[in-house]
Amino acid sequence: MDKQEAKHINMPSPSACEHKSVEAYLFIDPLCKDCWEIEPFIIKLWLEYGKYFSIRHIVTGKVDGTNASSHKWNKPANIRFVWEKTTSLQGFSCDGKVHMQEASSTPYLVSMAIKAAELQGRKAGSKFLRKLQEYIFLENVSNPDCELLLACAKDSNIDVEEFKKDLYSASAKKAFQCDLKFTNEMHITEIPSLVFFHANSDEEGIKIAGTYSYDVYVQLLKELVKCEIEPEPLPPLEVLLEATQFISSKEVAFIYDCSKQEIERELKKLQLKRKVQMIDVKCERYWKWIAKEKDLV
């Protein structure tokens, strides 16, 4: 792993082809384990190619069970091709006890909570979502209640009082309804799904359903940008840990393309410096940053 002196992750200066910026939309159900497992792919893609695209999380699901019959899927407009495949290639979690009966749809309150957090900004929403997924998949919380959602808000360092106000607000409800409408328009039938569009073009977008190898996402991004793009150097390990706050050895090894053993040697050095705390959860090892949090960008 290359060592760099930079202390922050800064976006590089614009290149000649950046006027063809790309918008990416990640369609998720926060109770779906596959939607959690795709996060390392998104983090790595953002770190290496983030200057070429923006990304938004779109919460899929139904408002309640009574509306299931009226939730129809329309044919997608302006989508060139669809890759339909659902498979987990990397295996970031080995716990098979996630409550799949609840994972098939997103409870209304959880969806509203994510939208409420996003009202404080996309970064706030992403932090809240990751913290929520940690509770769900590492502690097998199958039915998150209001108390747990407030704990997630506190742990993700967003404004808890503002979050309380927004949780049942018309703004959060409207944001969730917009996500549902967009899900319909894009004909999302599998999650996670990632849709890429040119930001300033009427050209068709690209949709990929399921989880693929990292190279597939890079190739699709290059196809949309339509010029040679080079990955930015990955940040120092400490910067990544500080930004994510809580991450597994396997995720870090994937992001840096190193062996798990090599990564854990570096992580244990940081543990000796009291910068991280090692936490073993079931059959996976996680690392919690115990210094002050900084943002990715």
Swiss-Prot record:
Superkingdom of the organism of origin: Bacteria
Entry GO CC: cytoplasm
Annotated S-S bridges: none
SUPFAM superfamilies noted in UniProt: Thioredoxin-like
Keywords associated with the record: Cytoplasm
Keyword Cytoplasm: yes
Pfam families xref list: Thioredoxin_5 (PF13743)
Subcellular location: Cytoplasm
Similarity comment: Belongs to the SpxH family.
Subunit details: Interacts with Spx.
Role according to the record: Adapter protein required for efficient degradation of Spx by ClpXP under non-stress conditions. Interaction with Spx stabilizes Spx and exposes the C-terminus of Spx for recognition and proteolysis by ClpXP.
Protein name: ClpXP adapter protein SpxH
Organism listed in the record: Bacillus cereus (strain ATCC 10987 / NRS 248)
